[in-house]
């Protein structure tokens, strides 16, 4: 007879004792029909309620607990949506689907996440109600999408292009929750770097917001030796109308740089050397000549590493009209340098931390071609790090970079304002791209008559169109509700008024929205509706929901430990 080893015989009762506490990792729970939809809708409601309170000029803030640091105070819809994670799996699925709506709208338009969330809730809620009364969910979805297409076509008709800096400031002000200072600073930034220029948002170091414009090519590498300083003001090296020598390789030999120095001297121009490194005999000779005969030269290490360094050097060559020595595929030796191989810049400023090449003399056509190449790479890449580096390179080649430095008295205040500045910046870019429509939810209200002419194929599609008709009133109603007035009355008054009249929630009065500058970017309104309708109408077609049953993790030794604790307690006294 086969006998089990003693160890295994002893283990069998233990395994039986553990058995009740173990559940399979792949066990699932399934709910069907109305039960599943009701639970998902509770999740949708919870998330939408939390996000909706932030809507409009009199919307409130939401305080979010964070795993580290102080709580986050925000009025940004997508930030609130992302923070919500519900314990109940079915409710959480509903919440996560609406979270996706907010995320998609934010990624595509950069703003309008609160509008998208309240629209999604309205469409899902009405859809569930009609399905419970026997309507066909697939046909309802078709009706919804038919209505959405008609609304988008109407929005395009209403849309007007953004033409003046004042309109840009108005769009930014509305998106920044009525903060005119933010609106003006964004308008100034766009004026200075162009509508397609690069604008970045950073933490400031003062109480006030500041705008810094960085023109030309700036990189974070300073002079190799402080002996290159040629001005007493600010410990920097400054040259006008200089030549630029670019090298991918390290320069150690003095013979390799003599030809370039001779060319610069013959043309009576300063020389800027940008290489992987300049050391040894080459560096000591440059410093000695700088000190003894006043040689106009400065040596700087090339920025970045690996391929990024090669790309940045190539960008500099194109911007200055020079060539990169040591570049793969080019048989260029430093000893054979000609005047046309050197880049040319109108001004150079080098400090101990960074260098700036201004007014490069590169060919416009070549620079445009390089910008196009980088733009194409940006569209392909999925890496956030790569995107950041490509955007930096793009900024240096284009009209420069505008840096918005957000000020405040504390980190909490700066972070809250940064959210609003980022939203305002995204809204402004969207407005420049596709134009503007009436703000305050009025644009969607003005689209309702366009749905009357639609001809649905059946009654269920007609229900889908009616769902969108009612949903289009929700953004304006939510803004009014947050301002402390009855939303349905406000909506009815707007619908009875002339086309440009709307409700100014800040003043609590009916005004001409265009004259008051209460406008929204067309792209933001369009994207919010499209994303909300797409996800919410899909949600209504769900008939079954599958979730994972969480694993029970109980420590079988805990009971014994509890006994020990009691015994030990008795022994202590």
Curated annotation (Swiss-Prot):
Modified residues (Phosphoserine): 67, 70, 410, 488
Linked residues for Glycyl lysine isopeptide (Lys-Gly) (interchain with G-Cter in SUMO2): 551
Top-level taxonomic group: Eukaryota
Keywords for the protein's UniProt record, in alphabetical order: Acetylation, ATP-binding, Chaperone, Isomerase, Isopeptide bond, Mitochondrion, Nucleotide-binding, Phosphoprotein, Transit peptide, Ubl conjugation
Molecular-function annotations in GO: ATP binding; ATP-dependent protein folding chaperone; isomerase activity; lipopolysaccharide binding
PTM annotation (N6-succinyllysine): residues: 31, 82, 125, 133, 191, 202, 205, 218, 236, 250, 301, 352, 396, 455, 481
GO biological process terms, semicolon-separated: cellular response to interleukin-7; positive regulation of interferon-alpha production; positive regulation of T cell activation; positive regulation of type II interferon production; protein refolding; response to cold; T cell activation
Residues engaged in binding ATP: 75, 111-115, 440, 520
EC number(s) reported in the record: 5.6.1.7
Transmembrane region(s): none
Record-linked PROSITE patterns: CHAPERONINS_CPN60
One protein family per Pfam: Cpn60_TCP1
Alphabetized SUPFAM superfamilies for the sequence: GroEL apical domain-like, GroEL equatorial domain-like, GroEL-intermediate domain like
Cellular component terms (Gene Ontology): cytoplasm; migrasome; mitochondrial matrix; protein-containing complex; secretory granule; sperm plasma membrane
Catalytic reaction annotation: ATP + H2O + a folded polypeptide = ADP + phosphate + an unfolded polypeptide
PANTHER family, alphabetized: 60 KDA HEAT SHOCK PROTEIN, MITOCHONDRIAL (PTHR45633)
HAMAP family: CH60
Protein name: 60 kDa heat shock protein, mitochondrial
Organism: Cricetulus griseus (Chinese hamster)
Taxon lineage: Eukaryota, Metazoa, Chordata, Craniata, Vertebrata
Name of the gene encoding the protein in the UniProt record: HSPD1
């Amino acid at each position: 007879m086969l006998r089990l080893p003693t160890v295994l015989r002893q283990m069998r009762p233990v395994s039986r004792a553990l058995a009740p506490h173990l559940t399979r990792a792949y066990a699932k729970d399934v709910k069907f029909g109305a039960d599943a939809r009701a639970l998902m809708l509770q999740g949708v409601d919870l998330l939408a309620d939390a996000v909706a309170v932030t809507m409009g000029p009199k919307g409130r803030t939401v305080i979010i607990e964070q795993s580290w640091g102080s709580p986050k105070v925000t009025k940004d819809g997508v930030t609130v949506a992302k923070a919500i994670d519900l314990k109940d799996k079915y409710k959480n699925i509903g919440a996560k689907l609406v979270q996706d709506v907010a995320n998609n709208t934010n990624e595509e338009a950069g703003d309008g996440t609160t509008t998208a969330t309240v629209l999604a809730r309205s469409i899902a809620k009405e859809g569930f109600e009609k399905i419970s009364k026997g309507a066909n969910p697939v046909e309802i979805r078709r009706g919804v999408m038919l209505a959405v297409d008609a609304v988008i076509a109407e929005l395009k008709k209403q849309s007007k292009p953004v033409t003046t800096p004042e309109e840009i400031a108005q769009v930014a002000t509305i998106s920044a929750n009525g903060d005119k200072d933010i609106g003006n600073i964004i308008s100034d930034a766009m004026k200075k770097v162009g509508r397609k220029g690069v604008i970045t948002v950073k933490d400031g170091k003062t109480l006030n917001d500041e705008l810094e414009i960085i023109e030309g090519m700036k990189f974070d590498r300073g002079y190799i030796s402080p002996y290159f300083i040629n001005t007493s003001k600010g410990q920097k090296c400054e040259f006008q109308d200089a030549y630029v020598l670019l090298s991918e390789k390290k320069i150690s030999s003095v013979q390799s740089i003599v030809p370039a120095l001779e060319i610069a001297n013959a043309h009576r121009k300063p020389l800027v050397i940008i290489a992987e490194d300049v050391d040894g005999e080459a560096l000591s000779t440059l410093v000695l000549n700088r000190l003894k005969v006043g040689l106009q030269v400065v040596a700087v290490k090339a920025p970045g590493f690996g391929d990024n360094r090669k790309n940045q050097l190539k960008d500099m060559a194109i911007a200055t009209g020079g060539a990169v020595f040591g570049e793969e595929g080019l048989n260029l030796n430093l000893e054979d340098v000609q005047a046309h191989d050197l880049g040319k810049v109108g001004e150079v400023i080098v400090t101990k931390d960074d260098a700036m090449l201004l007014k490069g003399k590169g060919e416009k056509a070549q620079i445009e071609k390089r910008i196009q190449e980088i733009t194409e790479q940006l569209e392909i890449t999925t890496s956030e790090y790569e995107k950041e580096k490509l955007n930096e390179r793009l900024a240096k080649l284009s009209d420069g970079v505008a840096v918005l430095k957000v000020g405040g008295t504390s980190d909490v205040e700066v972070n809250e304002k940064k959210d609003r500045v980022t939203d305002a910046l995204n809204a402004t870019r969207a407005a420049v791209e596709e134009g503007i429509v009436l703000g305050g939810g009025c644009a969607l209200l003005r689209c309702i008559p366009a749905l009357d002419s639609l001809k649905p194929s059946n009654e269920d599609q007609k229900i889908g169109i009616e769902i969108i008709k009612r949903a289009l009133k929700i953004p304006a109603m939510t803004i009014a509700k947050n301002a402390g007035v009855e939303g349905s009355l406000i909506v009815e008054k707007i619908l009875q008024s002339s086309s440009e009249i709307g409700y100014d929630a800040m003043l609590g009065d009916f005004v001409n929205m265009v004259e008051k500058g209460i406008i929204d970017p067309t792209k933001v309104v369009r994207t919010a509706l499209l994303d909300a309708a797409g996800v919410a109408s899909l949600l209504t077609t769900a008939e079954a929901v599958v979730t994972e049953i969480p694993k029970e993790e109980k420590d079988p030794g805990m009971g014994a430990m509890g006994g020990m604790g009691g015994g030990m307690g008795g022994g202590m006294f």
